[in-house]
From Swiss-Prot:
The name this protein goes by in its record: Microcin E492 immunity protein
Annotated keywords: Bacteriocin immunity, Cell inner membrane, Cell membrane, Membrane, Transmembrane, Transmembrane helix
BP GO annotations: bacteriocin immunity
Annotated function: Protect the producing cell against microcin E492.
Protein origin, superkingdom: Bacteria
Ranges annotated as spanning the membrane: 1-21, 35-55, 67-87
Cellular localization per UniProt: Cell inner membrane
Amino acid sequence: MTLLSFGFSPVFFSVMAFCIISRSKFYPQRTRNKVIVLILLTFFICFLYPLTKVYLVGSYGIFDKFYLFCFISTLIAIAINVVILTINGAKNERN
């Protein structure tokens, strides 16, 4: 299994979830709290989504690099979400 086929779904879901949460009115205003929410959300989705998929389907064939792929997909999703956070921050400063 390649990293692209494994990590696309969790990265996509974490980026979409971060975009939806960042638009809500209950989203924290301080940058530190935003980063904490970003990291926790991304970690939760990128690790638990593949694990629940494995357990729900019933194929317990967790391959050798499963946790490495989870960690790498988490880092990729955090990087994409930080870029989104930076763009939104720059956009809010202009207004």
